[in-house]
UniProtKB/Swiss-Prot annotation:
Organism: Candida albicans (Yeast)
Gene Ontology biological process terms, A to Z: DNA replication initiation; mitotic DNA replication checkpoint signaling
Compositional bias segments (type: Acidic residues): 271-303
Its biological purpose: Component of the origin recognition complex (ORC) that binds origins of replication. It has a role in both chromosomal replication and mating type transcriptional silencing. Binds to the ARS consensus sequence (ACS) of origins of replication in an ATP-dependent manner.
Biased composition (Basic and acidic residues): 239-259
Keyword Ligase on entry: no
Subunit structure: ORC is composed of six subunits.
Domain BAH: 60-180
Superkingdom: Eukaryota
Binding site for ATP: G428, L429, P430, G431, M432, G433, K434, T435, A436, E515, N548, R621
Localization terms from the record: Nucleus
Protein name per the record: Origin recognition complex subunit 1
């Protein structure tokens, strides 16, 4: 029916006429009235519907451009009260009149920001818009700019109806610069449908400015060197070319365009400068021969660090010095670097690699957003829920790790302020939040140092799984300190000399060594050096070692290394089901309110998933993966039954969806394959697991596994006397009694089970284990290539093999 709800009328306003024609329409649908609004910039006029909604109870009018208070609850005191800007009122298809609102967000709903960042009664614009029901309108509100708000006195009479707007934000935590809301609202009235686009432009412009500042810190210096080099080289050939640096310093109004041009023009500038440099070399070969000791060549050239470099010729011309290729960025003074190099290699040449440009930001063109008319609101909500439940999602806080956060923060804050070295060992099973907590601590320490609350420091992260070899850690650390790339052997000597030298200006260095058990070598010299350097009084080195087991220092490391590691050990225990529930709930609270009404994960479903995971491992990643998979299953059901669902009601993710997701993880193809293996293959895997736990090493030789199988089998089976015609499992696997007829009462047992080579080959081909390719069979190293939890969970359900674990 084309009728408005009871208590509501509407009026069509004609802007061209200076009068308002009001009609009480409850029957026949009127013709649409559209007016042309001339834009201030002289562009073509924009056509929009001028519909004014009237609430007959209090004769309150609502039109495009009004800021309103809206709720889906009982009234203004309801916690679901929100604020929005009406950007579109039109005749619709599903509803007689449809209203589109762009949303504000309260400053109190944003966590993780300083208390003095927001003003009282401040709202923030968001780029989110949705359709609402006008019967939920409460009242209009006053939204003022910063200058207007300063002239208003806020008291109890207007504290719920007068607000300040000077910033915009999005769901990624980005904020815009302070703007004048009065000017912004005037632009919105010209074309209200593009309000969300204008808000996105405000935020993106601010983000690009921040990236431009970081980009310009290094890029402008490099370009300045290139410009001076080009100008000086061309003087040799008497060429006068003006080099413009305007592209390096873009105006505020042209930030987006000039960034792209700046990046794209780098290669052409470099090529032009190289050609000018080659011409200068031909004309000034005599000068180059005099300056051979101070010029730095390209990537394959050699730089001589010797004591002779201190005796430089002061009369060398500036032209030839500038003609050299700009050297990579160094974090230390050039003289200090030369002193260290001269001590390590006083008469040798060392090759320095060219500094890479991986750290430079990449400017990508933004993707075009799909119009809201072609997207399903619930599909968008499902997408955001899955995004928030992803393990890589950045969080404002880490629930359940407050105590561990405080312990790590206190240790490192005291070490940085006192400028002393120390080692901290952090252990816990995978998925316990070790790395995330440490990164959160470093981020908070960085914020405190920027505000002057603690000393400045530098930070480096090393992951043992990402290093090609353990000695690469030396190269990465020296490159972080000096900017030079040298070999591992030279880097170790340079680092030893660097940390021994006393330098009062040196900042403390914090190193996170994640998966540090992967850098263990036979001599363990890499671990020894990294734990020995913090003991120097002049090092100012703080090492955070992260591994998975508590007793790893005693089991793997020698006494001299374990003693240097110290007694500062922080253990991350498994999450309880309450903590897992808090983690999932915290992520769901980050979803925008509009999408939060479309898709809901019930509290029973969250509790069921939390208890299931907490009873097994307490792994937060596993709990999030199960919930994310449950949302995917619920989304599939929604798309299949989309026609029969009521879009006004939220779609619920139930316990049944969680149970289906858990069954998929338990009954994975890998688990089914391991469960279907014969007993002999399971015995090989069980012996490999048992040997790995005994030695603490992931790789073990086949000879050790054969001995482990034989010993564990002898301990698990009984030794009662049996008749000559009876067979037991040991006879089947180890003796020839099964395949040959013998009269011996006690059969001779083989050293290995039958078809052992074929069993190992089949496991390798299936991808269950990895075997080293070496001539000696018993000395070949074997390693499990699948998650250990998968194998253990399957074997625990098998009564025949569980006793061998």
């Amino acid at each position: 029916m084309n009728k408005l709800p009871k208590g509501w009328n509407f009026t069509i306003v004609d802007d061209n006429a200076d009068s308002t024609n009001s009609e009480n329409i409850q029957g026949k649908r009127p013709r649409r009235s559209r007016t042309s609004v001339q834009r201030s910039d002289g562009a073509s006029p924009i056509i929009r519907d001028n519909i004014v909604l009237i609430r007959t109870d209090d004769n309150e009018e609502f039109k495009v451009g009004d800021t309103i208070e809206i709720t889906q609850g009982k009234g203004p005191e309801d916690p679901t009260t929100e604020y929005g800007l009406i950007t579109e009122i039109k005749f619709g298809n599903s509803e007689f009149i449809e209203v589109i609102v762009d949303w504000f967000i309260r400053s109190s709903e944003i966590v993780g920001m300083p208390n003095d960042f927001f003003a009282d009664n401040e709202l923030l614009l968001t780029p989110f818009r949705s359709e609402v029901k006008f019967i939920d309108f409460i009242r209009p509100i006053n939204v003022l700019s910063e200058s207007q708000f300063a002239d208003v006195v806020i008291d109890e009479s207007n504290s719920h109806s007068t607000f300040l707007v000077k910033r915009a934000t999005d769901n990624e935590g980005n904020f815009s610069d302070i703007f004048d809301y009065k000017d912004f609202s005037g632009k919105v009235l010209e074309n209200p449908k593009k309000c969300a686009i204008q808000v996105k432009e405000l935020i993106s412009t601010t983000v690009q400015k921040e990236l431009l500042k970081e980009f310009s810190k290094e890029q402008r210096k490099k370009k300045a060197n290139k410009v001076s080099t080009t100008g000086r080289v061309t003087r040799f050939n008497k060429r006068k070319e003006s080099v413009s640096t305007k592209a390096i310093k873009p105006e505020n109004k042209q930030v987006k365009i000039e960034i792209d041009n700046d990046v794209l023009s780098d290669q052409s500038e470099e090529k032009q400068e190289e050609s000018d440099y080659n011409e200068a070399e031909d004309a000034n070969s005599a000068l180059e021969s005099d300056e051979e000791n101070i010029s730095q060549e390209s990537e394959d050239s050699e730089v001589e660090y010797s004591t002779k470099k201190k005796l430089k010729n002061k009369k060398l011309s500036r032209r030839s010095k500038a003609a050299a290729t700009p050297s990579p960025k160094r974090k230390l003074q050039k003289k200090d670097i030369e002193d260290i190099y001269s001590v390590v290699t006083p008469t040798k040449r060392m090759k320095l690699g060219k500094d890479d440009r991986d750290s430079l930001p990449v400017f990508l063109s933004p993707t075009k957003s799909v119009p809201s008319e072609f997207t399903d609101p619930k599909s968008v909500a499902f997408k955001e829920v899955k995004q928030r439940l992803h393990t890589s999602q950045k969080l404002n806080a880490l629930p359940g790790r407050e105590d561990e956060f405080a312990m790590i923060y206190m240790n490192h804050e005291s070490a940085v302020n006192e400028k002393t070295g120390c080692c901290v060992y952090v252990c816990g099973l995978p998925g316990m939040g070790k790395t995330a907590t440490i990164k959160d601590v470093v981020e908070q320490m960085t914020y405190s140092s920027e505000r002057g609350e603690m000393e400045q420091f530098s930070y480096l992260e090393l992951n043992g799984l990402k290093l090609l070899s353990p000695t690469v850690a030396y190269e990465a650390l020296w490159h972080h300190i000096s900017g030079d790339k040298v070999s591992a052997s030279n880097a170790a000597l340079l680092l030893e000399e660097y940390f021994k030298r006393e330098d009062h200006k040196r900042k403390p260095l914090v190193i996170l060594m994640d998966e540090f058990d992967q850098i263990a070598t036979k001599k363990q010299n890499v671990m020894y050096n990294f734990f020995n350097w913090p003991t120097y009084s002049t090092s100012k080195l703080i090492v955070i070692a992260v591994a998975n087991t508590m007793d790893l220092p005693e089991r793997m490391l020698t006494n001299k290394i374990a003693s240097r590691l110290g007694l500062r050990r922080i253990q991350f225990r498994g999450y309880t089901f309450q903590q897992l529930g808090d983690i999932i709930t915290h992520r769901l609270e980050m979803i925008t309110k509009n999408n939060r009404r479309k898709v809901v994960i019930t509290s029973d479903a969250i509790g069921f998933a939390s208890r299931k995971v907490a009873s097994v491992s307490g792994d937060a990643r596993r709990a999030l993966t199960i919930c994310r998979r449950a949302v995917e299953i619920a989304e599939k059901e929604y798309l299949e039954n989309k026609k029969g669902e009521d879009d006004s009601e939220p779609y619920q993710v139930l316990i049944s969806h969680i149970s289906t997701a858990i069954n998929e993880t338990v009954n994975s193809p890998l688990s089914k394959y391991i469960a279907s293996l014969p007993f002999a293959s399971k015995l090989v895997l069980a012996s490999l697991l048992r040997r790995s736990r005994r030695t603490g090493l992931a790789e073990n030789s086949l000879g050790d596994i054969i001995d482990e199988m034989r010993n564990s089998f002898a301990m698990a089976t009984h030794s009662e006397e049996q008749g000559s015609d009876e067979l037991n499992m040991q006879d089947v696997l180890y003796s020839d009694k099964t395949f040959t007829a013998t009269n011996e009462t006690v059969p001779i047992l083989n050293l290995r089970i039958h078809f052992f080579k074929q069993i190992v080959t089949s496991l390798v081909e299936a991808g269950i284990i990895i075997q080293q390719n070496s001539p000696g069979e018993t000395s070949r190293l074997v390693k499990l290539d699948v998650p250990e939890e998968e194998v253990v969970s399957v074997f625990k359900k098998d009564n025949a093999i569980s006793q061998f674990l």
